[in-house]
Curated annotation (Swiss-Prot):
InterPro entries: MFS_trans_sf, POT_fam
Key words of the record: Membrane, Transmembrane, Transmembrane helix, Transport
GO CC field: membrane
Organism for this UniProt entry: Arabidopsis thaliana
Subcellular localization(s) per the UniProt record: Membrane
Gene: NPF4.1
Protein name as catalogued: Protein NRT1/ PTR FAMILY 4.1
PANTHER family, sorted: OLIGOPEPTIDE TRANSPORTER-RELATED
Highest taxon listed in the record's lineage: Eukaryota
Length: 515
């Protein structure tokens, strides 16, 4: 359903981009390198914040957990705003530099606070108003920056290749998601080691240096990039189409009028017959067929986006209850070495990195071009949703075994029992999020690609927020979730998520077939 329009790009001087000189694989590769560095910083901070809020800023554990969840959720939710700015007012390059700088300033504020004792509460006291102001200003400056960076960088990298070469664009998004996972792997291994052995203040300092280096690397590649000039606010165009269609709702539109409108328009989109009521917007001479097709295409993406939120709600458990489970298991590999709880995601991330590399190196030789179309990405997302349901069922079974051994035999089971659910959830995340990034980029109008690819991250945010709501609702009704896992009914909560995601899978299949 993609709108196929002739794309015009410029170089950094505003002249027409030259094929072979501007854009290409090298320019797209820079986006992958930068994403590795930026995501390592973001996830290292997310991991570090829990200890920082409780040990240094003296917040209670529940308060700190809520602060971290809200920070992560807000960061991903703001990707839709970052994508909107990149599509509407700035080039995607300029949007990255702007939001990357905001993220860096926020990180510098928290780094200074971590090193200056006057900016930290003393003697176990709660932080003062000025201290809290510095903390939350820095924290949400990072969230705004992360939202803008993740909302603009994937589309910028995709622009360097374009959509005509389907194999290359598919390969880019696989390697881009590989970069996301690589950054995550470095965060839960190298950065966790630094935090636990050198200190969280050093972790902040290193994160600041890495992010500054990422921005420098990205800007240094400017001469080889190609840029797409923003086409104005896509949301304004969508609203105008709806307003025009509403005003002309009582007028009759003939097929001849629709064909004439499409013929007179410069739009070269593949016309489709969904949301026919929008055709009435074309009776307004100020509304072009291109605007109507943009609106129609974007609307068709929303059910796919909405069908992935429950899956991300399940993935959110890897950072909450699954971590709690890890704390009450046997994590010792030897007498002197114990696996840090924050590093439990290392093995799943390693599996994801291996799977992505093997798929890109060997899988693409098996698949034909037709299989790598939008239908392939829809199937990929569907497989991810199905695997999520299975993983939640497995998580429930593992929790039953863990609790039985702990309560009846006073034995801590090995932490590697949990790795199965971690691996399965990580693989489902890889299939779904990776599929969404490529699907939304390829299927969206060229003028809305940043905002459309941001839908993938926005789904993650809404999944995290929904997880918080579900925990409150389920616990308020049933009382299943308590501080002591051995007295909780966590396995029943996992089964609730399994059932909800399975119902959601059928909902997704319905919309995917209609697409």
């Amino acid at each position: 359903m993609q709108i196929e329009m002739e794309e015009k790009f410029e170089d950094w001087r505003g002249k027409e981009a030259i094929s072979g000189k501007h854009g290409g694989i090298k320019a797209a590769f820079i986006a992958c390198v930068v994403e590795t560095m930026e995501n390592m910083v973001f996830l290292a901070c997310s991991t570090n914040f829990m200890m920082y809020f409780t040990k240094s800023m003296n917040y209670s554990t529940p308060k700190a957990a809520t602060m971290v969840t809200n920070f992560v959720g807000t960061s991903f939710l703001l990707t839709i705003f970052g994508g909107f700015v990149a599509d509407s007012f700035l080039t995607r390059f300029a949007a990255f530099v702007l939001f990357g700088s905001i993220e860096l300033l926020g990180l510098i504020m928290l780094t200074l606070q971590a090193h200056i004792t006057k900016l930290q509460p003393q003697g176990g006291k709660k932080p003062s108003t000025p201290q809290s102001t510095v903390l939350f200003t820095g924290l949400y400056a990072i969230a705004i920056g992360v939202g803008g960076v993740k909302g603009s960088l994937p589309a910028h990298g995709g622009d360097q290749i374009g959509t005509r070469n389907q194999r290359l664009i598919s390969g880019f998004f696989n390697w881009y998601f590989f970069s996301v996972c690589l950054g995550g792997f470095l965060a839960v291994t190298l950065m966790v080691w630094i935090e636990e052995n050198i200190g969280w203040s050093s972790s902040f300092t290193i994160s600041t240096a890495v992010l500054a280096s990422a921005i420098f690397v990205f800007v240094a590649g400017c001469p080889m990039y190609r840029f797409k000039r923003p086409a104005g606010s896509p949301l304004t165009r969508i609203v105008n189409v709806f307003v025009s269609a509403a005003r002309n709702r009582n007028r009759f539109v003939t097929d001849a009028e629709v064909v004439t409108q499409n013929h007179n328009s410069t739009d070269k989109s593949i016309h489709h017959n969904k949301f026919k009521f929008l055709n009435k917007a074309k009776l307004n001479n100020k509304i072009s067929a291109t605007q109507v097709e943009e609106t129609r295409t974007f609307l068709a993406l929303l059910p796919i986006f909405g069908s992935t939120i429950i899956m991300n709600c399940c993935v959110a458990q890897m950072g909450t209850f699954s971590v709690q489970q890890g704390m009450v298991t046997n994590r010792k590999l030897s007498r002197s070495f114990e696996i840090p709880v924050a590093s439990l995601n290392a093995i799943p991330l390693l599996c994801m990195l291996s799977s992505l590399a093997l798929y890109e190196l060997f899988g693409k030789r098996i698949l034909s071009n037709s299989e790598r179309s939008s239908s392939f990405n829809l199937k990929r997302i569907g497989y991810g949703l199905a695997l999520t349901s299975i993983s939640m069922a497995v998580a429930a079974i593992v929790e039953v075994k863990r609790k039985h051994e702990a309560v009846h035999n006073n034995i801590k089971i090995s932490v590697f029992w949990l790795e199965l659910q971690f691996v399965m959830l990580s693989l489902s995340d890889m299939l779904t999020v990776g599929g969404m990034l490529e699907f939304f980029f390829r299927e969206s109008p060229a003028s809305m690609r940043s905002m459309s690819t941001a839908l993938g991250w926005c789904s993650t945010a809404m999944g995290f927020f929904l997880s918080s709501v579900l925990v409150e609702v389920v616990n308020g009704i049933t009382g299943w979730l308590r501080d002591d896992l051995n007295e909780s009914r966590l396995e029943l909560f996992y089964l609730v998520l399994c059932v909800l995601n399975t119902l959601n899978l059928f909902n997704y299949i319905f919309w995917a077939k209609r697409y």
